[in-house]
UniProtKB/Swiss-Prot annotation:
This protein's name: Cell division protein ZipA
Subunit field text: Interacts with FtsZ via their C-terminal domains.
Biological classification of the source: Bacteria, Pseudomonadati, Pseudomonadota, Gammaproteobacteria, Pasteurellales
Keywords (A to Z) from UniProt: Cell cycle, Cell division, Cell inner membrane, Cell membrane, Membrane, Transmembrane, Transmembrane helix
SUPFAM superfamilies: Cell-division protein ZipA, C-terminal domain
Gene: zipA
Source species of the chain: Actinobacillus pleuropneumoniae serotype 7 (strain AP76)
Pfam families to which the protein is assigned, alphabetical: ZipA_C
Membrane-topology descriptor: Single-pass type I membrane protein
């Protein structure tokens, strides 16, 4: 009887030791796995040093306008224009019979030039009693599309003013050597040239842009990106990027917004998608869009949030900051 009791006691102790050893081994293994995971995985913070943007080739509407306005930007350099006009006006020499040219030259040099705004250079086309000592140097724009430049208009205005001064001086109505007369004419010409220089087209920001970026030190896999985009209704198409059409599944319907790779050249090569990875995606919508801009923007925002949730990323605004309620209101004000 005593042997049976001793046997049960030993069996119970053995079972307790085995259970304790199993629990201790499982706890140690679990602790080791979690310790390695947290030590190797970087903190989940958004990427702040993104330098890429929507490739110009993927924005055909604004790309042509930017190329066409490149020449006008070079031609309307305010500092260069102002310096040329000031030097040209100081070098005007008017000779009338019976008048000392040296005395008049000193008065012209003392005459102030009104330059509150950039003034356009002068190119007179006649030779009466007005002579230029030097020919001002002009910068030819790389692209010229305007039929009549502001420089030609300002030149015509200044030529008419000088001709009017000569006519009045010949009739004795005004003293052409009077400092007050010269100041009045120069101020009048400067004001007219300023009004011409201010007539410049203002480019409007006609694109809504949102970013989906991976956490710091991580990237999105290409096959996951394609799978998530197709699940959200995107279709692979023109420019080798994905588009969201007005009617889901109908590629013939108008495109509402698109998504491109954030890294240059911004495309998705489906033949190498298994080896593809990226730090982020850019979603953009042109304004005005097909249909209602507010409704399309809300659809874009909802799609962006769903995409970020599916990929485990973050949504950034056009300034590459975390998209918050202030960003939402700012975007809604733009599309309203």
């Amino acid at each position: 009887m005593e042997l049976h009791i001793l046997f049960f006691i030993l069996a119970g102790l053995l079972i307790a030791v085995l259970i304790g050893f199993s629990l201790w081994s499982a706890r140690r293994e679990k602790s080791r796995i979690f310790s390695n995971t947290f030590s190797t995985r970087p903190p989940s913070t958004p990427i702040n040093n993104i330098v890429s943007d929507v490739p110009p080739s993927l924005n055909p509407q604004s790309y042509a306008q930017t190329t066409g306005q490149h020449g006008e930007t070079e031609a309307d350099n305010p500092v260069q224009i102002q310096q040329e006009v000031e030097s040209s006006l100081r070098e005007i020499k008017i000779n009338l019979p019976g008048q000392d040219s040296a005395a008049y030259q000193s008065k012209v040099e003392e005459t102030p030039i009104y330059s509150g705004q950039p003034v356009l250079p002068v190119q007179p086309q006649y030779q009466t009693q007005v002579q230029y000592q030097t020919q001002p140097q002009h910068i030819e724009p790389a692209f010229t599309q305007a039929p009549q430049s502001p420089i030609a208009e300002a030149t015509s205005v200044l030529e008419q003013s000088v001709e009017e001064l000569e006519r009045q001086a010949a009739q004795g109505d005004v003293d052409i050597y009077s400092d007050a007369s010269v100041r009045v004419e120069l101020a009048k010409n400067s004001m007219q040239a300023d009004s011409v220089a201010e007539q410049k087209p203002v480019a409007e920001n006609n694109m809504i842009t949102l970013y989906v970026v991976a956490p710091e030190g991580q990237q999105f896999r290409g096959d996951y990106v394609v799978q998530s985009l197709e699940a959200l209704g995107f279709q692979y198409g023109e420019y080798q990027i994905f588009h969201r059409h007005q009617h889901m599944g109908n590629s013939a319907s108008p495109v509402i917004f698109s998504v491109a790779n954030m890294m240059q050249p911004g495309i998705f090569d489906l033949t190498k998608i298994e080896h593809f990875s990226t730090v982020g995606l850019v979603l953009f919508m042109h304004l005005p869009s097909e249909g209602n801009d507010v409704v399309n923007f809300k659809l874009l925002l909802k799609t962006t949030e769903n995409l970020a949730q599916a990929l485990g990323g973050f949504v950034l605004n056009e300034h590459r900051e975390i998209f918050d309620e202030n960003s939402r209101q700012s975007y809604l004000a733009r599309v309203s």
